Amino acid sequence: SPEAPHALISGTTGSGKTALARGMIASLAAHNSPADLGLLLIDPKGRGYAPFASLPHLLAPVAQSPQEALALLDWLVGEMERRDHEGTTLPRIITFIDELADLALVGGATVTAALTRLSQRGREAGLHLVCCTQKPSAAIIGSLVKANFPARLVGSVASAEDARVAAGIARSGAERLAGRGDFLLVVQGTTHRFQAAYCTEAELALHLGEGETPLPLATALCPSG
């Protein structure tokens, strides 16, 4: 929505954050054609988004290495600038990042700067970010997410301080959540508790079917002709 163009999903191991992100990807793919919606996936561990490797909505293969992630983010910044110049917003492109804190640590200032630009200006260009992290540390991601991710989906976290950074508000109680898909949605000053859906890889394959393998990253993002 215009009020929540980007989302941050936080939670420790076992909170269900990867399952929640998978459910979001599956739902978006099921309800939007590849002509209307493009997806970009950054998955440093190579496991979270593996079931979507052949999804027809993918604009490029799932990025795993820091170099692939940076190339993808660089392309997105260029696409944002192109759309700003031309006044276009379609098709919508949603980028899912499986571990924001790790990417910020490994990629350093270059990655942080690209993500900051995209989170600040991407909405007007039809570009959106959904970032997951199990390390909602203020020292690592605090400045990046503080004002730029208005929708927070918070699973069980390790401490009240992590809950504050993840939710963007004090005393959310996220450190007392049960895990396994027990989440808080914090948006526009309101908090809602919900249970995230869980889909096995077999169920995802059954419902999404098999698409063509995306083109290699360089070809997909920089096509010739």
Q: What annotation goes with each model-predicted range?
A:
Residues 210-225:
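C-terminal regions of RecA-like/P-loop NTPase motor modules
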Residues 1-167, 172-177, 184-190, 197, ...:
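P-loop NTPase catalytic phosphate-binding loop
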